[in-house]
């Protein structure tokens, strides 16, 4: 019998830390991009409103309609980027969890252990030699050491 603290490994592993840092970085870039576009849209809106009296009613309505479609496109792009980012990271997290499960299996086979329980589901264990957590964490870190994360938005690396 073996015991492993899956959550602890995910929390402490270098790969998950890198993934979290990258997620925050990409999220920040998306937010900075939307803020920049919002500033430009506010300027464009003020320009349209300031010219209201100088334009014909039809021209004003056309400019307003065009402006609203630009706002819609910016909002749509933001939602798409967020969705892509979230889906990418969920996919990466799943792959890392699957790899971690394989590492646990490899360690248990190497130590001739037939059953491994999650530490959170075990009430008490007195023999700490059955705790595979640190060994699994070390091996998981080694297997993910050369991992790189790149996300592409609209065919451009982020």
Model-derived features: where do they sit?
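Amphipathic, charged alpha-helical segments and their helix-to-coil junctions
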Residues: 1-158
